[in-house]
Amino acid sequence: MNSIDPRAIIDPSAKLADGVEVGPWSIVGPDVEIGEGTVIGPHVVLKGPTRIGKHNRIFQFSSIGEDTPDLKYKGEPTRLVIGDHNVIREGVTIHRGTVQDRAETTVGDHNLIMAYAHIGHDSVIGNHCILVNNTALAGHVHVGDWAILSGYTLVHQYCHIGAHAFSGMGTAIGKDVPAFVTVFGSPAEARSMNFEGMRRRGFSDEVIHVLRRCYKIVYRQGLTVEDALKELAEPAAQHPEVELFRQSIVSSARGITR
């Protein structure tokens, strides 16, 4: 059974699964679907087309699925898709996509999006990510699984943040961040790898040692990216984690943060 506060406004076309809660003064607009067990707090605005999965919690004053302010957007029917088990804290804004890209903004599963963070149009957030307070992603940004973006991190449009990457507080990212890499500063500079995060997630000492050596190949030996990638070929063939690191460099369109 759903629990809908009588002061909430639910459009007749919205689809709410069993066990959904909607708090007072929240607005669930047309073409919004909310999955089982999701809790919508007070003063939340949900605009469609938006699909929200199961067992999410969205806190007060968040605006989810609003039109993008991108000037090329002309009212086309784009969408937002949010997975399961996400926590979206106070004042978060997430915009739908544009037809010039995939026409979809995507948020995966088990993410923590903290207060006043912004996810721009056409962005793709993986699983188990943390966006700390006031993190702001421009349009078309991709964030890999398990990445952590500390408070006030700013990410330029089209940047890719690799899996398990980490940014320090107030970092301004203008280029791609390879998987596992830790960046700090404005503009961002690579400082190390997220070894503490790896240990917490159960990476073996052997894998951490190999990744440390691979980081030095890319960032400490003065090699060009092309030459560094050649050096990574052998360990990448032996360790999928190194291949993830290597591939995040190979696929970079904006160039990697150095």
UniProtKB/Swiss-Prot annotation:
Keyword Lipid biosynthesis belongs to the record: yes
UniProt subcellular location: Cytoplasm
Primary localization class, coarse: cytoplasm
EC class: transferase
Record-level GO BP terms: lipid A biosynthetic process
SUPFAM superfamilies attached to this UniProt entry: Trimeric LpxA-like enzymes
Keyword terms, alphabetized: Acyltransferase, Cytoplasm, Lipid A biosynthesis, Lipid biosynthesis, Lipid metabolism, Repeat, Transferase
Pathway(s) this gene product operates in, as recorded in its UniProt entry: Glycolipid biosynthesis; lipid IV(A) biosynthesis; lipid IV(A) from (3R)-3-hydroxytetradecanoyl-[acyl-carrier-protein] and UDP-N-acetyl-alpha-D-glucosamine: step 1/6
EC number(s) per entry: 2.3.1.129
Lineage top rank: taxon: Bacteria
Reactions performed catalytically: a (3R)-hydroxyacyl-[ACP] + UDP-N-acetyl-alpha-D-glucosamine = a UDP-3-O-[(3R)-3-hydroxyacyl]-N-acetyl-alpha-D-glucosamine + holo-[ACP]
GO MF annotation list: acyl-[acyl-carrier-protein]-UDP-N-acetylglucosamine O-acyltransferase activity
UniProt KW Cytoplasm keyword: yes
A GO-annotated cellular component: cytoplasm
Subunit structure: Homotrimer.
Role played: Involved in the biosynthesis of lipid A, a phosphorylated glycolipid that anchors the lipopolysaccharide to the outer membrane of the cell.
Family, as annotated: Belongs to the transferase hexapeptide repeat family. LpxA subfamily.
Protein's recorded name: Acyl-[acyl-carrier-protein]--UDP-N-acetylglucosamine O-acyltransferase
Organism, scientific name: Pseudomonas putida (strain GB-1)
Underlying gene: lpxA
